[in-house]
Amino acid sequence: MFKSNFEDYYEGGLATIESDNNLNNKKFDTFDVKKLTLDSFNFDQKIGFIKIDVEGHEFSVLKGSKKILKKYKPVLLIEIDKQHSSKVKETFNYLKELRYESFYFDGIDLIKILSYEENIRTDFKNFIFKHKE
């Protein structure tokens, strides 16, 4: 069975990580894999909601979904964790360029994020992005 430092870090859990992750500066084995973008699929119906939980690959997924985001303007629920990627700010800025507003849910209310700050509360990892229409 394949075992990596990532499994050690997460006590047996295995997921993908971005090569520029911030997990205690540990080194990991890398593998080339074929990827498909969401834009490469032909969807027959309107897409109203997309959930993204890709352990640091959020920015790549969004870039590969640009046509869908522009055409359908779906609501996005994205798990973003600073320890998995250095592209957190780029992710927020990219969606802002596409006219998305960002929010987080504090357990009671939906709170609008006016701008991404490096010191954004780290206990919030699930962010909601809604297109301005």
Regions of interest found by a model, annotated:
Residues 37-133:
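Conserved acidic-Pro-Pro-aromatic motif
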